[in-house]
Amino acid sequence: MGHALELKTRYSLADYLQHEEQSPFRSEYFRGELFAMAGTSDVHNEIAGNLYALLKGRVAGSGCKAFIENLKLELQANEHYVYPDVMLTCDARDRADRYVKRHPRILAEVLSSGTEAHDRFFKLPRYLQLP
C-alpha cells in the first residue's frame, strides 16, 4: 500500500466506494483514510498471475472462485478495505457482491521492497484475525 492521500476531511465509506468507481487508481481504505496503491513490477505481476492461474485451475467446477489484485476485501465492516494480490473464496455469501468479498479461504500478498513492511506488519495481522 502507498502513502495516505492529502486529506482535508476524512472519507466516509460511501465516499470511498464512489471514489473507487470513478478513479483510474486503486486505494485502500482504513478508518476514513485512503491509501494509494503502488504500481507493481513485471515480476510481482507474474508471481501473482501464476498463483491465480494455479488456484483457478485447481478449483474449477467446485463453486470456489479465484481473484487477482483488483477486487476489494472487507477486513472490518465500514472500517477497512484492501486489495489482496490473490484471493480465493468458496463462501456462497461472497456471490452477492461483485466488488467486495468478505469470506476468503486463501489470501496472498506478493512482497516487494516497497510493500513488505506494510503487508507483513499491518495487513497480515488483520488477515490472521479473519474467521
Task: Locate each region found by the language model.
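Gly/Pro/Ser/Thr-rich low-complexity, intrinsically disordered segments predominantly at protein N-termini
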Residues: 1-131
